[in-house]
Amino acid sequence: MSSGANITYASRKRRKPVQKTVKPIPAEGIKSNPSKRHRDRLNTELDRLASLLPFPQDVINKLDKLSVLRLSVSYLRAKSFFDVALKSTPADRNGGQDQCRAQIRDWQDLQEGEFLLQALNGFVLVVTADALVFYASSTIQDYLGFQQSDVIHQSVYELIHTEDRAEFQRQLHWALNPDSAQGVDEAHGPPQAAVYYTPDQLPPENASFMERCFRCRLRCLLDNSSGFLAMNFQGRLKYLHGQNKKGKDGALLPPQLALFAIATPLQPPSILEIRTKNFIFRTKHKLDFTPIGCDAKGQLILGYTEVELCTRGSGYQFIHAADMLHCAESHIRMIKTGESGMTVFRLLAKHSRWRWVQSNARLIYRNGRPDYIIATQRPLTDEEGREHLQKRSTSLPFMFATGEAVLYEISSPFSPIMDPLPIRTKSNTSRKDWAPQSTPSKDSFHPSSLMSALIQQDESIYLCPPSSPAPLDSHFLMGSVSKCGSWQDSFAAAGSEAALKHEQIGHAQDVNLALSGGPSELFPDNKNNDLYNIMRNLGIDFEDIRSMQNEEFFRTDSTAAGEVDFKDIDITDEILTYVQDSLNNSTLMNSACQQQPVTQHLSCMLQERLQLEQQQQLQQPPPQALEPQQQLCQMVCPQQDLGPKHTQINGTFASWNPTPPVSFNCPQQELKHYQLFSSLQGTAQEFPYKPEVDSVPYTQNFAPCNQPLLPEHSKSVQLDFPGRDFEPSLHPTTSNLDFVSCLQVPENQSHGINSQSAMVSPQAYYAGAMSMYQCQPGPQRTPVDQTQYSSEIPGSQAFLSKVQSRGVFNETYSSDLSSIDHAVQTTGHLHHLAEARPLPDISHLVGSCSSHARMKFIQEQDTGTVRVGHQYTFSKTDFDSCI
């Protein structure tokens, strides 16, 4: 295998060189030169032969002499093949040529072959047994970039990748086994020798193994390719008739096999590529870019007929103002170099539509002089066009033509005499009045200049996208007026406040009043009226106006009917009120149901512990006799307001300071841990918290219960003191909210259990609201005067009797004195009578103890626990220690 540097691929063929300027004939006449006359005759015959080729004129003009001869031979061979292949029987091959030619002339009027090639996703390729391209369709240019004239009668190996040439040669052989002597030179391409077969050696043409389907890579010159394009070849081997080739001995060779295949890209094209391939069109222009011709695709895309396109004058009239200078630069480059290069700009299509195209223009010469311009346009999408526009240079010559200044009627840096699209100051002025005053006449500029082309453009093409013209007959206008007149009164009754609130209502009302005057007042000149032109340019018709009026009608009618606008509604207060009512209406039973299951499992453990302590206490002698139970009603009178005096409860004196009751809502405080049950080791309990409002009405059942006497405790502390000798606490007074913040614990908060505290079992309890001062530890004064509660002393205890300010008191409490060393709770059960009555107001019962705790509470009778804030249960001894 030879090196890659020596491998040659097909490239663009050389073009016809530019001829020198013809020198003037001297006065003495033409000198006789046989060689010069021979060359002139040869050139004349070649030009006449080239004119007979079935190619466009722009292709013929760039062909050199060798290309003209090559294509002429190829055309003659193709014609001979069709002369034989189109005949039905061998008998007609001699005498039926005239009839066949007549049929071909009739078929020339039908261009279905061209349409089939356009619809085909690929191109047609015919390759002979000696690897020459016998025929290639014109659509090969869309896939490989080569023109049809560049590949016909050329070696196919120049188009095939070196690694795929052997496979392509194998597919050309009828037995897929080419002769080893017939090798392929990878450096030059064509085979070393050709092998011809007789009909006896070849299989029938319709044999199944004559079909071919394979893949190989072909040379591609398009910009979107990496150099090669993978193609799929599908076809079969057929006999190539009418070639009349002769062997080395001069004998006529029989027809040989050739590959007739359709080459399609291996990767299916995208939708954009399909659209682009199908809409590539070409236009023909003069040297000043005046259009003189357009193909069928161009007429389909732009919408113009060839007459409309060629009678407008300069081609710059079809170019967007923002792209004129950019195209002029490419135009000058084409005049100098012969090709403009890829240029992206906007073309004006029919019905004031702009189409982005990518164009490449070439200069065509005739007789050594530039004759005309051939431009190939490829349509682009709007997104692609905007991308190219952003990449374009925005220097000063393009500042006025970018579209932001002139096209949308914003102030421009040019003087008024150079402004092609002046600003319209009066909308009610007809075009005949203002055009001569602010716009220079087109006669002031050269007809082929850019300014003249810009002036000749219609102003409306730069204002907005086009829309279908609205029907402006009198019947349509009167129908619109009759439909709109029924709600004019209700619209006027809406008031000035609604008009100020919705600005568009005023505009709709003005249009409605204008329509009420009739079509004669609105459009006196119909289509020549200036208002109609503005509406047409803006894409607004009467159907849009009617829709706007209907929308404003429904909006105004609902406002006039007394409905409140949603924007004026402040729902903050309503939301807060709803939340507060929901909290106030929450039932107290939910709290009871939630608290009881949490500590139900602790009751059994507590009872066992209490029984054990009772057995230990019975073994010790009692220090003193227990006092009989006393009624709480003997201490407090429900009809009397308590003053600043001492009250004795079960032999215990406490100082009560009357203060007005404070109602509060419990704010969410930071998490705090409280060791409430110190008698149990290693047990945790969760106390869910839900804020309650102390103003919720509720009922409470009171029933007498039989409570056993408390067990006897240590004799170290005696709590019966005279009330007058009771000394007030020396601790500073705190706020009512301090203890509330202490009690509030978020839901599902785990608390550690202090083994030194007493454990209680939750039973049926009474719900109530409570506020108290936070219990603060302090030093003990004297054992005789007062027992000070300290959270640090284990087993410190007292008990607290239930206080009721109003109503009948049927509950009795023992006057038994508790010891500091142990904390004992009773295990008796309550026996209530179903009697419900409103809870009396006990908020006036206030007092202060040594720990400065002030509370509103209701105590459980059987377990000695107090329900605080509907969510917290404390032992009786904990509250006793606060008194």
Curated annotation (Swiss-Prot):
Motif (Nuclear localization signal 2): 36-41
Motif stretch (Nuclear export signal): 63-71
Region (DNA-binding): 37-65
Signal peptide per UniProt: none
Annotated stretches, region: Disordered: 1-38, 421-449
Location of the motif Nuclear localization signal 1: 12-15
Regions of compositional bias (Polar residues) in chain numbering: 436-449
Residues covered by region (Required for maintaining the overall integrity of the AHR:ARNT heterodimer and its transcriptional activity): 49-81, 116-124, 260-262
GO cellular component, one term: nucleus
Post-translational modification: Mono-ADP-ribosylated, leading to inhibit transcription activator activity of AHR.
Gene Ontology MF term list: E-box binding; nuclear receptor activity; protein heterodimerization activity; protein homodimerization activity; sequence-specific double-stranded DNA binding
UniProt-annotated location(s): Cytoplasm; Nucleus
PAC domain ranges (all copies): 342-383
Function: Ligand-activated transcription factor that enables cells to adapt to changing conditions by sensing compounds from the environment, diet, microbiome and cellular metabolism, and which plays important roles in development, immunity and cancer. Upon ligand binding, translocates into the nucleus, where it heterodimerizes with ARNT and induces transcription by binding to xenobiotic response elements (XRE). Regulates a variety of biological processes, including angiogenesis, hematopoiesis, drug and lipid metabolism, cell motility and immune modulation.
UniProt subunit comment: Homodimer. Heterodimer; efficient DNA binding requires dimerization with another bHLH protein. Interacts with ARNT; the heterodimer ARNT:AHR binds to core DNA sequence 5'-TGCGTG-3' within the dioxin response element (DRE) of target gene promoters and activates their transcription. Binds MYBBP1A. Interacts with coactivators including SRC-1, RIP140 and NOCA7, and with the corepressor SMRT. Interacts with NEDD8 and IVNS1ABP. Interacts with BMAL1. Interacts with HSP90AB1. Interacts with TIPARP; leading to mono-ADP-ribosylation of AHR and subsequent inhibition of AHR.
PANTHER family to which the protein is assigned, alphabetical: ARYL HYDROCARBON RECEPTOR (PTHR10649:SF9)
Domain notes: The PAS 1 domain is essential for dimerization and also required for AHR:ARNT heterodimerization.
Name listed for the protein in its UniProt record: Aryl hydrocarbon receptor
Gene from which this protein is expressed: Ahr
